[in-house]
């Protein structure tokens, strides 16, 4: 499913291609690209749930907003998000790329993935997808995009 999401993000969303694509045509394009129907269905469902945030149909878990509070991860979250992923989320909060709400959206979307393995690079792409879809997060999206591509080029300052 994550491969389908990456393909969709890079092909349709990130490239600013026509975003209003007929779902049947999209499913056929993905099938023609070699993706499994179940993975396609799960990826589209994942994106629909993400769109619910954008449309205000869903809200992330509301947590205490005390700046001195610390996010405690559940065992399920720790299983999916290793120490490097959790540290990266904290780093993004500290540099104000993520806030409490967007962090919770990211965690919820990560837990909704069906990947057996999940790494820091995967998390970075999920963060980009979430920030891209949330109104008012354009600057955070741009910062995250810069971080992603600077790290990939080995030039993180």
UniProtKB/Swiss-Prot annotation:
Pfam families assigned to the protein according to its UniProt record, in alphabetical order: DUF494
InterPro entries: Smg
Coiled coil region boundaries: none
Top-level taxon of origin: Bacteria
Family indicated by similarity: Belongs to the Smg family.
Protein name: Protein Smg
Organism: Escherichia coli (strain SE11)
């Amino acid at each position: 499913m994550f491969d389908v999401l990456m393909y969709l993000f890079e092909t349709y969303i990130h490239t600013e291609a026509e975003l209003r694509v007929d779902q049947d045509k999209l499913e056929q394009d993905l099938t023609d690209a070699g993706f499994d129907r179940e993975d396609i269905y799960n990826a589209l469902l994942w994106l629909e749930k993400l769109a619910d945030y954008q449309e205000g149909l869903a809200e992330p878990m509301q947590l205490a907003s005390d700046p001195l509070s610390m996010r405690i991860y559940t065992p399920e979250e720790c299983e999916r998000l290793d120490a490097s992923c959790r540290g990266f989320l904290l780093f993004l909060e500290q540099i104000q790329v993520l806030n409490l709400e967007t962090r919770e959206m990211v965690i919820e979307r990560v837990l909704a993935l069906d990947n057996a393995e999940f790494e820091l690079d995967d998390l970075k792409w999920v963060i980009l997808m979430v920030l891209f879809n949330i109104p008012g997060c354009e600057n955070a999206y741009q910062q995250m995009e810069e971080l992603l591509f600077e790290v990939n080029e080995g030039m993180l300052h």
